[in-house]
């Protein structure tokens, strides 16, 4: 995606452009910074800088749906089993229906206090759990079907940056493998 919110699909081998589409918010200033994108077998899901998730067809870049979010995202959505999971700057994670874009559930994590790194980590998703990192240093394991809490942990106390500024953000994608989860915080 370029600075004008134009997203291009290019051939991997030749660089030939297959399609280009605008994924910003129509009628708004184009200076917002987006979060990222992910894909399944048929669609591309973009968290743009305008507090929206946009679903496009991979084949031609046609917009399938566009969902307004209650706050901006600064991470790529995670897609698995017909759900799109997106973390928001205000400490929420949402599960969206991948086919239609409606919100299935919302979980509000601990936002925390102090300074923040202006970005977020994407959630890690398995068949059984959504591992959601939050700016407060909280890591929550949620049930993918309804967002119910399986467990939570607070990974780090706030780190003093100097003066009164403190930060405790989780900035790396949690890794899930062989029945364990590993996450890094600031």
Please describe what each predicted stretch is.
Residues 9-12, 38, 45, 85, ...:
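Mobile, glycine-rich extracellular loop/lid and propeptide segments
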Residues 17-38, 63-80, 103-127, 152-178:
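Extracytoplasmic beta-rich repeat domains
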Residues 11-15, 57-61, 97-101, 143-147:
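Short loop/turn segments that connect beta-strands within beta-propeller blades
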Residues 2-3, 32, 48-49, 88-89, ...:
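Structural signature of WD-repeat beta-propellers
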Residues 2-16, 135-140, 163, 171-186:
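Beta-propeller domains
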């Amino acid at each position: 995606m370029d600075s004008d919110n134009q997203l291009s699909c290019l051939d991997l081998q030749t660089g030939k452009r297959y399609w280009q589409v605008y994924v910003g918010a129509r009628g708004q200033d184009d200076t917002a910074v987006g979060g990222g994108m992910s894909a399944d077998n048929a669609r591309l899901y973009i968290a743009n800088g305008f507090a929206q998730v946009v679903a496009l067809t991979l084949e031609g870049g046609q917009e399938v749906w566009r969902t307004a979010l209650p706050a901006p995202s600064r991470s790529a959505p995670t897609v698995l089993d017909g759900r799109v999971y997106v973390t928001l700057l205000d400490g929420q994670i949402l599960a969206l229906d991948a086919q239609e874009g409606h919100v299935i559930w919302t979980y509000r994590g601990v936002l925390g206090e102090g300074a923040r790194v202006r970005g977020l980590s994407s959630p890690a998703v398995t068949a059984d759990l959504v591992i959601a990192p939050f700016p407060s240093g909280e890591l929550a394991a949620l049930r993918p079907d309804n967002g119910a809490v399986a467990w939570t942990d607070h990974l780090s106390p706030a780190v003093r940056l100097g003066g009164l500024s403190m930060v405790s953000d989780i900035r790396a994608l949690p890794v899930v493998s062989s029945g364990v989860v590993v996450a890094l915080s600031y």
